[in-house]
Regions:
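Active-site-adjacent betaalpha module
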Residues: 1-48, 52-90, 95-302
Length: 302
């Protein structure tokens, strides 16, 4: 490559709002690279970056410890494999304040909003401990299905990834590398915007936690079949990365030739504290049951 890693990424500002690197300049540099276009790659490799956004960096609204170092390793991996990666897809968690997992959707008996990380159960609704300010019938229906069908509990998150804010944006240095690749390889970045339904969480990129219409992103699932390798990294390992992988492997559970093409970069993702044990159990199942490859970014050869 003509461009150096440090021309594209400044590791000292990962997770910060300002970007000292001029995007126009690095895209001009990308255009001067001599790579073959993505469509001519004999081996089709997809890099799927899950929610690598400002609000999930350490200083973000829902910061994940270790996220900034994850971004450094992710950008180094993409740089080292620039010509081998055919395409990049990124998920972008996108919300408004008035969603079922944000505080202002709920009040207690005294009219107070729940603190972030409060768990709200069906029993809490029945006892009057918490009640929905907005759409109480659908809110109860969501919690009921979440507990019965998904075996989960609604967690109230800090306001995060609010549409149009800096927290909603891709992390700056990651974005530098992603769009450098896009121009250098003549490959359009696929953006998977998720999380806009006010009545459901959407951790995974394929479907909502609960949806009365039963929508799943078949278009993206069908695209996955065309790749020889699917590389996955991002934040948080315990939630959006885990659920994205789970949704993909469950859809392809009878097709191991697809699931064994998945490579998860274990040094390029971190968990929200408190969820580590259950997360490791889930990833072990991905490996044993679905033949998903769990590797370090420095170990995989493209």
């Amino acid at each position: 490559m003509k461009a150096k890693y440090t021309d594209i990424v400044n590791v000292n500002v990962i997770g910060k709002a300002e970007n000292p690197i001029n995007v126009n300049e690095i895209l001009k540099m990308a255009d001067k690279e001599a790579f073959i276009p993505s469509r001519q790659n004999k081996e089709r490799v997809l890099f799927l970056g899950i929610d690598i956004q400002q609000d999930f960096m350490e200083n973000g609204a829902l910061g994940v410890p270790g996220a900034c170092k994850d971004v450094e390793r992710i950008t180094q991996f993409i740089y080292n494999n620039m010509d081998k990666i055919s395409n990049i897809a990124v998920s972008i968690d996108t919300h408004t304040p008035h969603q079922i997992f944000h505080p202002c959707w709920w009040i207690d008996e005294n009219g107070n909003y729940p603190e972030p990380y409060t768990l709200i159960t069906l029993a809490d609704l029945d006892s009057g401990k918490w009640k929905a300010v907005i759409n109480p019938i659908a809110s109860r229906d969501y919690i009921e299905h979440l507990e019965q069908d998904r075996k989960k509990t609604l967690c109230i998150w800090p306001y995060h990834c609010i549409q149009g804010t800096t927290g909603n944006a891709l992390e700056n240095q990651f974005a530098n590398m992603v769009y450098f690749h896009s121009v250098a390889k003549k490959a359009v970045v696929q953006r998977l915007v998720k999380g806009q339904d006010p009545l459901s969480e959407m951790y995974g990129v394929i479907r909502l936690e609960y949806d009365t219409k039963g929508f799943i992103n078949l278009e993206f699932l069908n695209k996955l079949e065309k790749f020889d390798k699917i590389i996955i990294a991002g934040e948080a390992k315990s939630h959006c990365v885990l659920e994205s992988i789970k949704q993909i492997v469950e859809y392809y559970k009878s097709r191991p030739e697809i699931t064994k093409k998945i490579y998860v970069l274990e040094d390029c993702m971190s968990s929200i504290p408190g969820f580590e044990t259950i997360t490791e159990q889930a990833f072990l199942e991905f490996k044993q049951r679905y033949q998903v490859n769990i590797v370090k970014s420095t170990e995989i050869t493209l």
